[in-house]
Amino acid sequence: YTLSLHDALPISPAAASPKPFDLTSTAFLIVAFLTGIAGALQTPTLSLFLTNEVHARPAMVGFFFTGSAIIGIFVSQFLAGRSDRKGDRKSLIVFCCLLGVFACLLFAWNRNYFILLFVGVFLSSFGSTANPQMFALAREHADRTGREAVMFSSILRAQVSLAWVIGPPLAYALAMGFGFTVMYLSAAVAFVVCGAMVWFFLPSMRKEPKVATGTLEAPRRNRRDALLLFIICTLMWGTNSLYIINMPLFIIDELHLPEKLAGIMMGTAAGLEIPTMLIAGYYAKRFGKRFLMRVAAVAGLLFYVGMLTVHTPALLLALQLLNAIYIGILAGIGMLYFQDLMPGQAGSATTLYTNTTRVGWIIAGSLAGIVAEIWNYHTVFWIALVMCVLTLSCLTRIKDV
């Protein structure tokens, strides 16, 4: 990705001639990849881990995702408000990586549902906040060095997707081949390397301490549209979370297909998301962000219709193209849409966007657990389909920026 980075980013003539290799941008790319890998080694197998290792019922599995999302929101709100007001994001990211390591160690050796939920998830929440903080730091770095923020951000997102191409199949291979302990220890290693990279290579962006206001600032302009966008992104991420919680168990328990297929499906979708994100970032100016979000929602609708109707490995893998368009555009454009609706509030906009994923997890956790407990895993995809329809109706009302 270093090549494409330099094609996309304008470099001042002075900086261009003596050093063609830009260490800071490369470090950002590697850190984005590592924070992605740390997450991608844990999330895809979590519902399976809770079912098989912790022996939790479907409702308890769903509740675990909900609980972890709620704890995550409190942690990230606290950190976001703090980092936008006072200083250095860099030391904060290192701290988050350190707690991420402790979380992985706990999951590696503990099998008590409640300890994992309250202690493990609290630590993981700090770990997962390393990612949005890294994006906020990247945005500040881009603004300060006069870079094209949209493209730089899209390329960083693509790194996270790349991590999700490798992560899920690797997670299933490690968990099925060597056990969950080895899988969680691998994630811990990713956090260690990531923390070290941040500490040694990322820039410190000192801020002048501002007068403290609320933790997360409300949008100063476009309030109605920011709220609508929050609902849209929450619904879209919610369907995706339903899919991540539900799909592995659906594939294994109801379709009786091999376990590794679940990992391959997630990896395939993530691989196809990379070109989708970059293309979306490229065309955002020409077509507008609202149009692209509508394209995404239609793709999502078709994807869940497919999940309800096709049950062979080849077709399930083919469907991932629609899933990639759906999530690739959402991941690439959603955050930038928030930043455009909330000018001058990059940290709050980014966190608001990140919280749509968490609220999506809250809704998905409760729905997936209850629906699977009462009916079956197949029914969960009907819920996702309804959420896609709601998304499309909200997208008719939002303004373009």
Q: Model-found features: residue ranges?
A:
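A late C-terminal transmembrane helix in Major Facilitator Superfamily
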Residues: 344-374
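Intracellular juxtamembrane helix-capping segments at the cytosolic ends
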Residues: 128-143, 329-342
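Structural signature of the two symmetry-related core transmembrane helices
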Residues: 91-105, 188, 291-306, 385
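Helix-loop boundary and gating motifs at the non-cytosolic
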Residues: 17-69, 240-254, 262
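Short, small-residue-biased leader/transition segments that mark boundaries at the very start
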Residues: 1-9
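C-terminal transmembrane helical hairpin of 12-TM major facilitator-type secondary transporters
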Residues: 290-334
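Helix-to-loop junctions at the C-terminal end of transmembrane segments
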Residues: 74-88, 175, 276-288, 372
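Hydrophobic core of transmembrane alpha-helices in multi-pass small-molecule transporters
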Residues: 33, 114-131, 234, 315-329
